[in-house]
Amino acid sequence: MIVRPQQHWLRRIFVWHGSVLSKISSRLLLNFLFSIAVIFMLPWYTHLGIKFTLAPFSILGVAIAIFLGFRNNAGYARYVEARKLWGQLMIASRSLLREVKTTLPDSASVREFARLQIAFAHCLRMTLRKQPQAEVLAHYLKTEDLQRVLASNSPANRILLIMGEWLAVQRRNGQLSDILFISLNDRLNDISAVLAGCERIAYTPIPFAYTLILHRTVYLFCIMLPFALVVDLHYMTPFISVLISYTFISLDCLAEELEDPFGTENNDLPLDAICNAIEIDLLQMNDEAEIPAKILPDRHYQLT
């Protein structure tokens, strides 16, 4: 995620980091070079009686813009829902530990439970990003718990099970009444709902056929556009063609990024920073001495 301060409008025009321009610059360069080639081809295809006009491109351009808008809205809706889910995880994690600490006597067991919560957040992050988990989770889980988690097809869900088992032990030992156990178990259900919601977004992409047809149409439009522009614009064709192509190609590229909000690209959610915030909050609630430093944006204003 790019977290930039407010900028002057003129300075913002030339921003590079965080813009999709860095990803599509090579495609725009090809469009520029192809437009130059079309200028030299103009006498040849005019001699053959081939004539392109802007009218069909105007109609097609409007249609593409509408469908790109729909796709970007769908991608942004996934992005917003994903952020809400992680916000719910932060709320549920704080509330669960607060209720445990105010109900049970402060002990090493309660601190262990807090580490299970931290492990869950990191495990969910790494699962969504398809990253290796063993090294990170080893800092928070006991050896036997770590082995159970890594052997599971759903590591985050296994950690939830271990948390549920911990609550059950406290209940059997008489530390929790039935009412308190049900209340705390409801918090675990809230966290489980977050897990299911994130999995729904991660494993249900926007239909491929819809993405493919829009992607093809955008690039065919950008390839054919110089033939229609060159008749009236001549040597200005490359510049106008690149400007129009930038609009369509950048929207297509941005939609691809928003479709998977859990990745590590510029416009994805800062899951590292969110997990870091959860860890800091839970450790401070337990009055731990060693607290990790807060993750801040880098020099390019990016949070991962």
Curated annotation (Swiss-Prot):
Chief subcellular location: membrane
BP terms from Gene Ontology: bacterial-type flagellum-dependent swarming motility
MF terms in GO: chloride channel activity
Protein keywords: Cell membrane, Ion transport, Membrane, Transmembrane, Transmembrane helix, Transport
Transmembrane parts of this sequence: 28-48, 50-70, 194-214, 220-240
Protein topology in the membrane: Multi-pass membrane protein
UniProt superkingdom: Bacteria
GO cellular component, one term: plasma membrane
Location relative to the cell: Cell membrane
Keyword NADP: no
Keyword Transmembrane helix found: yes
Family: Belongs to the anion channel-forming bestrophin (TC 1.A.46) family.
Protein name: Voltage-dependent anion channel-forming protein YneE
Originating species: Escherichia coli (strain K12)
